[in-house]
A protein has these predicted regions:
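Cofactor-binding active-site loop characterized by glycine-rich and histidine/acidic residues
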Residues: 8-152, 170-172, 184-185
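Glycine-rich ThDP/TPP pyrophosphate-binding loop and its adjacent helix/strand module
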Residues: 119-124, 135-138, 142-150, 155, ...
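Iron-sulfur cluster-binding cysteine motifs and their immediate structural context
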Residues: 1-5
Length: 231
């Protein structure tokens, strides 16, 4: 986890695929880039197998640009639509068992601080509403209680979109889904309120139709988690 891991080993550049050479030469590693510069540098995430027009994929692209030091960052995820794109990004990605992403991130975050001391090494969890608010809720909440120094990003599309359309805790009351044909009968979970109650140092909600705000929020979240506690 350093700028060195994305560079070429001497003498091997000519053997590397063009995509890799482009990433080293024109990617964001070791540079300060912004969403306002999209199109002028090679993004960490470009090609992906997500559905055409998926807003979640746009958000993931924006979040990857916003990460302050991508060369010193590990992404952690779990089952869900989002991991199909996250796993294609040029950032180390740890894919845990369903719902254990915040437990994995807790160990990684602590281990990196022990190994590298004061050098900034960031851990960012990115998972869907099912993995975060339902199946992984226990580990998510307790990582917040412990003030673990990493960022948790919930990709809330209000449905288990990868397994047929089941309702989740984050589905809005009354929403009709393939696996909830009569509509959800319960309210959407207040994850923002729960995060505040658990003592997160920084809590925010964003939508991908405001790229500059996405960039600002993600950057703040990672930097605050690095120095203060859970975000």
């Amino acid at each position: 986890m350093s700028l060195d891991y994305v560079k070429f080993t001497n003498g091997f550049e000519k053997f590397m695929p063009k995509e890799y050479r482009d990433m080293v030469e024109h990617g964001p590693f070791g540079k300060k880039v912004s969403v306002s510069q999209m199109g002028s540098f090679k993004e960490i995430l470009e090609e992906h197998p997500m559905c055409a027009g998926c807003a979640m994929t746009l958000f993931i692209r924006l979040a990857m640009i916003a990460v302050p030091n991508p060369e010193d960052t590990i992404m952690v995820g779990t089952a869900g639509c989002g991991r199909l794109a996250i796993s294609q990004a040029a950032i180390p990605f740890v894919y845990g068992n369903y719902g254990d992403q915040n437990g994995v991130a807790s160990g990684l975050s602590r281990g990196l601080r022990l190994r590298f001391g004061d050098k900034p090494k960031d851990v960012v969890v990115m998972a869907g509403d099912g993995g975060t608010a339902d199946i992984g809720f226990q580990q998510v909440l307790h990582s917040w209680f412990r003030k673990e120094r990493f960022t948790t990003i919930m990709l809330d599309n209000e449905v288990y979109g990868n397994t047929g359309g089941q309702e989740s805790g984050m589905t809005s009351r009354g929403s009709v889904l393939k696996m909830a044909p009569l509509g959800k009968k319960f309210d959407k979970m207040d994850m923002v309120g729960l995060a505040k109650l658990a003592g997160c140092a920084y809590v925010a909600t964003v939508v991908p139709n405001n790229p500059r705000r996405v960039e600002s929020v993600i950057k703040k979240a990672v930097l605050i988690a690095r120095e203060v506690g859970a975000s």
